[in-house]
């Protein structure tokens, strides 16, 4: 296919050509994909090795890293320089997920049997449950201890990296690897503590999904609802490999997903997270004929923007895994209205481009923040 991003353009593009131009601009170069992947693997290995050496309990509990997020779904744009990693932990006792009925998608992790890790649990009625604040403190203390020694991780082609702790949220531990030989190159990692469960352990009160016996996870997360008190025992369920099954073999869907991310970045909508966009596509895939995935990426983008605007108007975007959980709970009414207004303007501009089969440089600037 002709790469419009690499040619000189002397006349207005058709709608399809304009969309392809954007896809070419935001696509990841094969050489970048390879070198970032290799460097990330080496950095991850050194990071885990250092913590395992620092903390024998972590070494005995660690069960590997599982890629999640946009890199797993192959929808990252521009550079493959961010990696979301589930850090799998196995406790030496039995853990049972107990749904929190008042908070859809959340569970307690009840600990029982021998060898309950007293330093990571708290009392819940007459039983023990994993305390996410203690788990996060455990991770944080280990990271703080090893970061100073990870100042020169050697990778391929003479590149070396220094690690810096950038954690600010309540779920992931964010580590930035700064390339010492190239100040413009860095790699960001979000390490999320994750307790792994088999598909058969998925709580029965939650909707059932196609899973091919793949695992799901419980990750530390405070309640995402406004004006609700925190509970240190709360964990959120996630199943990235189940969700990946829904998106697989739908290349036009993934192209529409990438276009949505580029549109969001260009129009100052930072609270429309990548997972928010993913939830729009998961919901559309879950309802027969809501979107025709055989359409061109540009037409899928138009439909997806229309759907997101509808969800913002209603104030609710259902989670794919647990539909009673609202993915928009943390957006204020004013922010929802602001984002919806922007989306409606973009939607109308795209419709005009589609109907006249022409996408000018000004159109691309308005929608995607780029020109040809």
From Swiss-Prot:
Enzyme Commission identifier(s): 2.7.7.-
Pfam (any one): Mab-21_C
Cofactor(s) essential for the protein: Mg(2+); Mn(2+)
Regulation: The enzyme activity is specifically activated by double-stranded RNA (dsRNA).
InterPro entries (alphabetical): Mab-21-like_nuc_Trfase, Mab-21_HhH/H2TH-like, MAB21L/cGLR
GO biological-process terms attached to the record: defense response to virus; immune response involved in response to exogenous dsRNA; innate immune response
UniProt: ATP binding residues: 70, 82-84, 240-243, 261, 274-278
Chain positions recorded as GTP binding sites: 68, 190, 236-243
Swiss-Prot/TrEMBL keywords: Antiviral defense, ATP-binding, GTP-binding, Immunity, Innate immunity, Magnesium, Manganese, Metal-binding, Nucleotide-binding, Nucleotidyltransferase, RNA-binding, Transferase
Protein name: Cyclic GMP-AMP synthase-like receptor
Organism: Drosophila eugracilis
Lineage: Eukaryota, Metazoa, Ecdysozoa, Arthropoda, Hexapoda
